[in-house]
Each structure stands twice: as structure tokens, then as C-alpha cells.
Amino acid sequence: SVAVQLVKGIHSFSLLAIPFFILAGEIMGAGGISRRIIEFTNVLVGRVRGGLAQVNILASMFFGGISGSAIADVSSIGALLIPMMMDSGYDTDYAVDVTITSACQGLIIPPSHNMIIFAVSAGGVSVGQLFLGGMLPGVLLGMALMIISYVIAVKRGYPKGAKISFKEAIKIASSAILGLLTAVIIIGGVIGGVFTATESAAVACLYAFIVTFFIYREIPLSKMDEILLNALRTLATVLALLACCNAFGWFLAYLKIPALITGALLGVSNNKIVVLLLINLLLLALGTIMDMAPLIMITTPILMPVIQSIGMNPIQFGVMMVLNLAIGLCTPPVGAVLFVGCTIGKISMEKLTKSLFPFYAAMLAVLMLVTFVPEVVLFIPNLLLK
């Protein structure tokens, strides 16, 4: 029955990682970690032309590795850096473009709760391998965005950042290191076999709590009520979507829709390149009109037989799917990250979309690498999990 499928949709041990990662992200976002990451990345890349854009992208890479959420990234990093960039002479469209596209790194750089959703939807794909598989594509995405940002910054004549003394740099790095260690603990623990991906989420949550309230101490413990409420709101939305999408997936399977779509795609061509391009086009189109979590739940059972028939590794497919749908989050008409960025920057979606095309090109280039060069995804999992 439908009720049974609704319950089955959220009755999974792997899904326990999601509330812990959401809560860890909320705690560290509220406790000053985003500001410290910005200061730390400014030490690393702030002095180049358009330095604040490079800081924005690198900060998103680090923060995404903690929160695993693009919206959390834009809300915290963007709320600080978009006004800062505008005050420093950067155009509003450029500041928002850099922020929303770089936020997509958090969806593929571990930990990503969307990877966990894919793992469950795909029927037990290793979450640890998915986490490791997303590392190199996430870094490549960041590098591609940094190159595009630098080219535009030089063309528009944006300023360089101020020089930071060695003594000040050491002070900033030592202040940020505890927050950055969250991602190291998660990935290191999974690789070393100390704990599973689900257990790592609980450890990350406890570590975030200790660092925020007993070491950084920027906010009082009484703020925990608000943090828990925000995490609960996010979790309620995610779990409701998962439950309903599982029931929907059951209906699709009952009606043999996956088999029909597999036949339709392979009927166009049995060439692997053509089939992969068609799947990418399908996911990109769907990503512009639907949110990521339900799309993963709906499309994974449909497309997995197609992927298996052409011999693609499920880990590679998972990273490819999440990156596709991440692009959709900053694409109109229903890009959640795009909406948040426009709200912070006080700019219309129509004006912003025109200036986004060079950034879309960079993201699509990385997507093509992920799709057609398996080692981009599989190199690190094969190296570390032999």
C-alpha cells in the first residue's frame, strides 16, 4: 500500500546521517565558522586580481565540506561576502554569480546528504565511495570557477586584496583550523575504517557542538534552541520528500515506467556517448524545474537500468547526477540557490541569468569530464579503498 511505501522511504539506517549533517551545518554556520573560513581563504588567495571572488569560491569549497548544503553555503558565506564584494567595487551580478555557482561545490564535496539520498535510491551504493568520488570533481569545479572569475575580474579591472603579514596569517589560520578539521574527521574516519559514513555524521555533530559552544564561544548555549528548530524545519522537509518520492517510485516500478524509459533511450541509440548525453540533457532540464532531493529519488530507479546496460559505474553516475542537478539549483525558473543569491544581492533574476553564462560553461565543462572520464570520479575511491 501507499502508506507502507511512505514509511519504507525513510526507514533506512543510512538516512540517519542526514539529520546529523544538517544539525552540524546549522551549528557551525551560526557559530562563526563561516567568518573564520573567509578570513583563512583571504590569506591564501586574497591578493590576486579579483581576490574576493577567489576567496568566495575557496571559502565555499571549505564550508561545503562541512555543511554539505548549497543553500547553507549561500546563506552564510554569501550573506558576508556579497555585501563585502559590492562595497569593494565589484558589480552586483558578478558577486552573486560567483557565490551561487561556487555553492554547488558543497553538493559533491563530502559530506553531502544528497549523495546519501542517491545511495539509498540506487539500492545500497557505498556512501563512503560516493563521498570520495565527489572530492576530485568538487575541486575541479572550484578551479574552473576560479579561472572564469579571474578572467572576468581582469577584464573588468576589479581590485586586489590587501597584503596580510605573516604573523597575522598564522593567527587567522590557527583560528580557522578547528572548524576545518570537521571535514577531515569525517573523511579520515570513513577512509580509515574508524566509523561508517552514518557514524561520522554523529561524530561531526558532536565535534561541531564542542568547537562552537566551548572553544569559539561566539554564541551562547541558549542559541541551541533556535539552531535545533532550524535543523528540524530542514529535516522535516527532506524526510517528507523522501517518503513521498519512495511511494512515487513504487508506482513507477509497478507501471513498468523504468523499463519503458530504458527502452526509449536505448531505442534512440545504443552508442554509450549518445545515451550519456541524452541522460545529461534530461537531468539538466528536470533540474531547472524541480528540487534536487525528489529528483534523485524519482530518476535514480528509472535511470539505473540504463546506466547498467551501458556499463557505467554507479559511483560515477551518482556524482554525474548530483552535479547535473546542482547546476539546476542556480538555473531559472526554480533554482533555489539562485533565488537566495538574488535576495541577498537585491538583483533581479533576469539580469543575473544573463551574466551567468560563462560560469555555466565552466560547470558544464566539469560535467563532461565527470561523464566521459571515469577516473575523475573513481581515482580517489580506488586509491584509498582498495
Regions found by a protein language model. Name each.
Residues 1-386:
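Alpha-helical transmembrane segments of multi-pass membrane transport proteins
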